[in-house]
Amino acid sequence: MAIIHPKVRGFICTTTHPKGCELNVRDQIEATRKLGVREDGPKKVLVIGASSGYGLAARITAAFGFKADTLGVFFEKPGTETKAGTAGWYNAAAFDKFAKAEGLYSKSINGDAFSDEARAKVIELIKNEMGGKVDLVIYSLASPVRKLPQTGEVIRSALKPIGQPYKSTAIDTNKDTIIEASIEPATEQEIADTVTVMGGQDWQLWIDALAGANVLAEGARTVAFSYIGSDITWPIYWHGALGQAKQDLDETALRLNQKLAGEVKGGANVAVLKSVVTQASSAIPVMPLYLSMVFKIMQEKGVHEGTQDQLDRMYRDRMYRTDGAPAEVDEKGRLRLDDWELRDDVQNACKALWPQVTTENLFELTDYAGYKKQFLNLFGFERADVNYDEDVATDVKFDCVEL
């Protein structure tokens, strides 16, 4: 038990609130339920990177939008009697509790999702507990490091531009001030390493392992999440080291699509999602300012979406359409859920606003207040229905295999 308040260092909140995290998950489940439960669609779903952000949302839509049995893989820190664990641990625990209350199969694996050990455990559970096959594999890993399964070598990714230094207006989120951010370009080695960590190699290893073990159902699909963003963030993102990794993901999708079409009449796609506040996006320089602006503009235009809205739309309007039509894709075979964010009217408003923002008018011209609230929400804070001066149980256990 502990009384827990937020402590923010840099772009990380170092504390989490178990009750707040549980209520966040409950709200996401309710949002999905409101759209109705479908009988068709995916029934046995594996989510790699299932404890927060888009991966968690993908698991929630599968379970509570389509009554699917789900297996989630993630790397989180459990809480103890005296100390809170990571937000993802409590998110996964809450998901498990609500899924089981619904009579759905739910199991989780806590360990390194990049490891062969995790793949072996997943295959074992699919064979022994999930009827032998899965029909959807969601790949949603966002990690700054990857330990290579063959050699044990640890590779790190770099959030850097390519070619020349990147200078831009940004928010110092600790001081709530507008600053000039400058980032030196990535070296060739850093670019290669970023592709190794954030590209399609591990996704390919997962699908190869699952296909090799014959645990992919007829018609099985796989989707990996990506972000392209607008040209405002391109120097640091799409045209930076991370963009190279995401292009590798695109190429992997084309290979996997051919493989699955041939082997199980299935398919593979990259899904390009909109920018949202996640632990991953808050680490990217310039993103907090861009998010604060784009949220305000999209809210004004009535097209703002959170993580859960995006995933519900991906399943319902793209992948599993009631009219049975194939998903609409772009010229590279990608599912585009960033379509509303990239509308000309939205982006032009962002570009017009960008040079006007100063420390003095930051809260007035943008939804930075909303950004800050959503950031703290990720860790279970800033909820009106939680008394943060009360003791809360931190040692939460659930149906999770520890690797």
Swiss-Prot record:
InterPro entries: Eno_Rdtase_FAD-bd_dom, Enoyl-CoA_Rdtase_cat_dom, FabV-like_NADH_b, Trans-2-enoyl-CoA_reductase. Keywords: Fatty acid biosynthesis, Fatty acid metabolism, Lipid biosynthesis, Lipid metabolism, NAD, Oxidoreductase. It holds the Pfam family Enoyl_reductase. Substrate binds at residue 227. One of its GO terms (biological process) is fatty acid biosynthetic process. The keyword Lipid biosynthesis applies. The record marks 76 as: Plays an important role in discriminating NADH against NADPH. One of its GO terms (molecular function) is enoyl-[acyl-carrier-protein] reductase (NADH) activity. The active site is at 237 (proton donor). NAD(+) binds at residues 49-54, 75-76, 112-113, 141-142, 246, 276-278. Pathway: Lipid metabolism; fatty acid biosynthesis. Its EC number is 1.3.1.9. It is an enzyme of class 1 (oxidoreductase). It catalyses: a 2,3-saturated acyl-[ACP] + NAD(+) = a (2E)-enoyl-[ACP] + NADH + H(+). It comes from the Bacteria. Involved in the final reduction of the elongation cycle of fatty acid synthesis (FAS II). Catalyzes the reduction of a carbon-carbon double bond in an enoyl moiety that is covalently linked to an acyl carrier protein (ACP). Monomer. HAMAP family: FabV_reductase. This is Enoyl-[acyl-carrier-protein] reductase [NADH]. It comes from Pseudomonas putida (strain ATCC 700007 / DSM 6899 / JCM 31910 / BCRC 17059 / LMG 24140 / F1). The lineage of its organism: Bacteria, Pseudomonadati, Pseudomonadota, Gammaproteobacteria, Pseudomonadales.
